[in-house]
């Protein structure tokens, strides 16, 4: 059984027991329980259920394992022959969520 959820403006495929990396969930601390109620699709033994746009009475329950920052990317701005270059770095915040159960 799996579900497609919407979280932080993105769509994720989730199953019970997997670890999901989302954009940082600011309102939740490590160890807090998270409920995703924006479920777009649910596939189980009886078939596929598609929401319009979301399914009612379906929740995904998870637990925030940790918050962290991703790998550093470097953005380079460069002008040839002008001795001009700028380098910026960026590390995106993320939240690691363990999916505990799918309730429907």
Curated annotation (Swiss-Prot):
InterPro entries: bL21-like, bL21-like_sf, Ribosomal_bL21, Ribosomal_bL21_CS
Keyword Signal found: no
GO MF entries: rRNA binding; structural constituent of ribosome
One GO term (biological process): translation
PROSITE patterns: RIBOSOMAL_L21
Example of a GO cellular component annotation carried by this entry: ribonucleoprotein complex
Subunit structure: Part of the 50S ribosomal subunit. Contacts protein L20.
HAMAP family: Ribosomal_bL21
Functional note: This protein binds to 23S rRNA in the presence of protein L20.
Protein's name in the database: Large ribosomal subunit protein bL21
Taxonomic path: Bacteria, Thermotogati, Thermotogota, Thermotogae, Kosmotogales
């Amino acid at each position: 059984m799996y579900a497609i959820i919407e979280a932080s403006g993105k769509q994720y495929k989730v199953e019970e027991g997997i670890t999901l990396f989302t954009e940082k969930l600011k309102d939740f601390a490590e160890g807090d329980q998270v409920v995703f109620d924006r479920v777009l699709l649910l596939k189980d033994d009886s078939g596929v259920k598609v929401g319009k746009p979301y399914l009612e009475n379906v929740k995904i329950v998870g637990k925030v394992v940790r918050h962290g920052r991703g790998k550093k990317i470097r953005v380079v701005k460069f002008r040839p022959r002008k001795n001009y270059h700028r380098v910026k770095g960026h590390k995106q915040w993320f939240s690691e969520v363990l999916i505990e159960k799918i309730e429907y």
